[in-house]
UniProtKB/Swiss-Prot annotation:
The keyword Cytoplasm applies. Belongs to the profilin family. This is Profilin-1. The gene is PRO1. CDD domains: PROF. Keywords: Actin-binding, Cytoplasm, Cytoskeleton. InterPro entries: PFN, PFN_euk, PFN_sf, Profilin_CS. Occurs in many kinds of cells as a complex with monomeric actin in a 1:1 ratio. GO terms for molecular function: actin binding. Binds to actin and affects the structure of the cytoskeleton. At high concentrations, profilin prevents the polymerization of actin, whereas it enhances it at low concentrations. By binding to PIP2, it inhibits the formation of IP3 and DG. GO terms for cellular component: cytoplasm; cytoskeleton. It is found in: Cytoplasm, Cytoskeleton.
Length: 131
C-alpha cells in the first residue's frame, strides 16, 4: 500500500459524516511521504520544532505549534507521542511513529476527539508495523 493510500483512505476518511480538513505523513527529517491536496505548505523549521517537542516535551507550549505560519495553541498531549493544538473551532493532532509524523488538521463540525482518533489509530498501526 502506498503512503498516499494511507492518507486518502485512512486519514481523509469520513467519520460520522465529517472528515479532516487536511492530512499528511511526513518523515521525521521533514520530507513529505504523502499528503492531501489541501495540506498547507509548511516550513522545515516548523517540523524541526515539532520534533524538538517530542524529544523535550513542553518546548512548544510557550510559543505555540506553527504549521504553514498558522499558530496553534498547544493543549494536552502525550509527552513524546502526541502533540495536540487548537486554533478557534479547529486544530491539529500530530502523532509520532518510529520514522514519521502523522498530521491531521480539522475544523468544525469535526471534533478534536474525532481527529485524535483518526490520527492516533493510524499512528499506532504504523508503530505496530515497525514504521
Amino acid at each position: 500500500m502506498s503512503w498516499q493510500t494511507y492518507v486518502d483512505d485512512h486519514l481523509m476518511c469520513e467519520i460520522e459524516g465529517n472528515h479532516l480538513t487536511s492530512a499528511a505523513i511526513i518523515g521525521q527529517d521533514g520530507s513529505v511521504w504523502a499528503q492531501s491536496s489541501t495540506f498547507p505548505q509548511f516550513k522545515p523549521e516548523e517540523i524541526t520544532a515539532i520534533m524538538n517537542d517530542f524529544n523535550e516535551p513542553g518546548s512548544l507550549a510557550p510559543t505555540g505549534l506553527y504549521l504553514s505560519g498558522t499558530k496553534y495553541m498547544v493543549i494536552q498531549g502525550e509527552p513524546g507521542a502526541v502533540i495536540r493544538g487548537k486554533k478557534g473551532p479547529g486544530g491539529v493532532t500530530v502523532k509520532k511513529t518510529n520514522q514519521a509524523l502523522i498530521i491531521g488538521i480539522y475544523d468544525e463540525p469535526m471534533t478534536p476527539g474525532q481527529c485524535n482518533m483518526i490520527v492516533e489509530r493510524l499512528g499506532d498501526y504504523l508503530i505496530d508495523q515497525g514504521l
